């Protein structure tokens, strides 16, 4: 598996992204993988990598980039910690359709320049918070 990272410039700032694609000759069908409200974490990245193993170039953008540099979410205590819940909800509130559509234009442009990705047709998947964004 080829894993990497890239910063994609949008109208609202620089989005840190993870990339995955199978080894060997591409280009591979492109997929944008929208995260859930728990953010970028090992479980989410493992899911994106599994998708890439099926023959896709997967881009996983950190949709919380508008919050600036933020401390990693504490998934172990989130359920019982009102302060952590409030912090997550503040970041989720920044993920709105209009902003994501602007970001998506930059992600599509990234695929057009990426030789390992097919940019003619691009899939979008999302989980939880990312599901409605994918639609």
Residue ranges of predicted features:
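N-terminal cap/leader regions of alpha/beta-hydrolase-fold enzymes
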Residues: 1-135
